């Protein structure tokens, strides 16, 4: 049983869309796979809130309405509950800055991942925000991925500035000593010029294969995205024989 970690160059770059595409593609190969989002936020956009004055209103860290988690549930063929594939959902963003952030227990995340690894062939673990985003005051998602020695898939939202973000993230993944299985290009800005040139340059600079290109789509979370993923051999390093 194996798990791998999917991260992105930023927030809103299409991590969950890429997760759906990978899950669907591997299921088409007969692999039993589920997604796991250990920490989810009901909003990842930059919204000003006065945390000191809104602790009570924003303290619902066990809600079950995160769209990313719900998309992961709908993407797998397995019958999973919200609680099974999510350890914490916050109604506010970045709980590290709030009292509620203290409720995140790494031990619970470890146990939830171990439970999924024991039950399913493969577990796609989707991070939140970017690679070095803190989980608490002393620990970030990159640290947690390293503690489990999970190989990494990087989602690059193709936009202005993505070259710098992508290369810095790749460098940090390498510094953590984790293998980069590959990267996925997600076209989040249909009007961006030089798209092909950006893909070519990233392919030249990143020492890992391009696993797929997801075009700009309307409601991609409702579509069959498997056809956009290739180089599946990079994602099937795990055992692919189901237990009897």
Curated annotation (Swiss-Prot):
InterPro entries: DTB_synth_BioD, P-loop_NTPase
Subunit: Homodimer.
Record-listed ATP binding positions: 12-17, 68, 186-187, 215-217, 222
Entry EC number(s): 6.3.3.3
Gene: bioD1
Protein name: ATP-dependent dethiobiotin synthetase BioD 1
Main location: cytoplasm
Family in the record: Belongs to the dethiobiotin synthetase family.
Keywords: ATP-binding, Biotin biosynthesis, Cytoplasm, Ligase, Magnesium, Metal-binding, Nucleotide-binding
Keyword presence, Transmembrane: no
Pathway: Cofactor biosynthesis; biotin biosynthesis; biotin from 7,8-diaminononanoate: step 1/2
Source organism, top-level taxon: Bacteria
Organism per entry: Pasteurella multocida (strain Pm70)
Pfam families, per the entry: AAA_26
């Amino acid at each position: 049983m194996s798990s791998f970690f999917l991260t992105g160059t930023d927030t809103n770059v299409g991590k969950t869309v890429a997760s759906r595409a990978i899950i669907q593609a591997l299921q088409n190969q007969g692999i039993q796979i589920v997604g796991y989002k250990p920490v989810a936020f009901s909003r990842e956009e930059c919204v000003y809130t006065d945390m000191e004055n809104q602790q009570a209103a924003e303290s619902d860290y066990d809600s079950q309405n995160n769209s990313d988690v719900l998309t992961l549930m709908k993407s797998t063929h397995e019958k999973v509950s919200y609680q099974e594939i999510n350890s914490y959902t916050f109604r506010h963003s970045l709980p590290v800055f709030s009292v509620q952030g203290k409720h995140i227990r790494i031990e619970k995340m470890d146990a939830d991942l171990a439970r999924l690894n024991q039950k399913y062939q493969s577990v796609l673990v989707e991070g939140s925000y970017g690679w070095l985003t803190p989980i608490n005051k002393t620990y970030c998602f990159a640290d947690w991925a390293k503690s489990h020695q999970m190989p990494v898939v990087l989602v690059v939202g193709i936009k202005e500035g993505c070259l710098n973000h992508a290369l810095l993230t790749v460098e940090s993944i390498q510094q953590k000593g984790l293998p980069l299985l590959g990267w996925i290009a997600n076209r989040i800005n249909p009007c961006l010029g030089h798209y092909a040139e950006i893909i070519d340059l990233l392919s030249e600079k990143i020492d890992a294969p391009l696993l797929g290109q997801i075009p700009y789509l309307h409601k991609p979370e409702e579509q069959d995205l498997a056809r956009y993923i290739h180089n599946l051999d990079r994602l099937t390093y795990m055992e692919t024989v189901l237990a009897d």
